[in-house]
Regions:
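Residue-level marker for buried hydrophobic side chains located in beta-strands
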Residues: 34-36, 65, 85, 152, ...
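Internal catalytic-core helix/loop-beta-alpha segment
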Residues: 111-144
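Short, well-ordered coil/turn elements that cap or connect secondary structure elements
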Residues: 2-4, 80-82, 127, 184-185
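Conserved beta-strand hairpin/beta-sheet module of binuclear metal-dependent hydrolase folds
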Residues: 1-53, 144-159
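Short, flexible loop segments at the rims of nucleotide/cofactor-binding pockets, characterized by
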Residues: 6-11, 41, 62-64, 111, ...
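Active-site HxH/HxHxD metal-binding segment of metal-dependent hydrolases
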Residues: 39-122, 210
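Glycine-rich phosphate-binding loop signature in dinucleotide/nucleotide-binding domains
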Residues: 28-29, 54-59, 125-128, 185
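Metallo-beta-lactamase
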Residues: 40-42, 131-134, 139-214
């Protein structure tokens, strides 16, 4: 497990998303430990072991931020009993009233339990040292978190120019708009929803833009 600034990077197993634990314990905030995405919930023992390696327990997680509503990112939400749930307002309906067409849980042979959503994020909201950026395209309510150097981008962009698929609740035009927004950021570290996290984030954003036919 690698730590970048105050973010611990936890690699997802098999179909699980990556998870990112933001250590906000020195900020004096109500949210000391923030977990970004929880995977499918099918590898909970591994995720717990990684969290305990940091020196905290699952019960210590105060807030879960889901980058979007797909099962491989929200399926483990139930394992953190004291955590509030935050997601973009456009994807909140999928957690409050789960629909397999929105969560794509049927692709994993599972279901998503109904969740309370405590925080509905919008563009420009703040959490810890990060700003919320709306990045639809993979879903209508995709979001990214940016702190001036680190971009936690869910399934919007992957290393080496990949982008999230747009045929399961997404939209290519939304994806292009999101990439147009992200290409203007100064990104030293790109932390995607799957696959490796990488340095020189702008180079990977550039490759994604080129793949989508966007001039960089």
């Amino acid at each position: 497990m690698e730590k970048i600034s105050n973010v611990y990077c936890i690699e997802g197993l098999m179909a699980d998303s990556n998870s990112y634990l933001i250590d906000n314990s020195n900020d004096g905030s109500d949210y000391k430990y923030i977990l970004v995405d929880t995977g499918t919930g099918q590898s909970d023992a591994f995720l717990f072991s990684q969290i305990r390696e940091i020196g905290i327990e699952p019960e210590d997680i105060d807030l879960i931020v889901n980058t979007h509503c797909h099962f491989d990112h929200v399926g483990g939400n139930d394992f953190f009993p004291n955590a509030k749930i935050a997601i973009h307002k456009k994807d909140a309906v999928a957690l409050r009233d789960p629909d397999s067409e929105l969560t794509v849980s049927s692709l994993f042979g599972s279901i998503v339990r109904k969740h309370d959503v405590d925080i509905e994020f919008e563009e420009g909201d703040k959490i810890a040292n990060f700003e919320v950026i709306s990045t639809p395209g993979h879903t209508s309510g995709g979001l990214s978190l940016y702190d001036g150097e680190i971009l936690i981008c869910g399934d919007t962009i992957f290393a080496n120019g990949g982008v999230g698929r747009m045929d399961i609740g997404g939209n290519p035009n939304d994806m292009k708009s999101s990439l147009m927004c992200l290409k203007d950021l100064d990104v030293k570290y790109l932390l995607p929803g799957h696959g490796p996290w990488v340095k020189n984030g702008n180079e990977h954003i550039k490759m994604s833009c080129m793949m989508m036919g966007i001039k960089y």
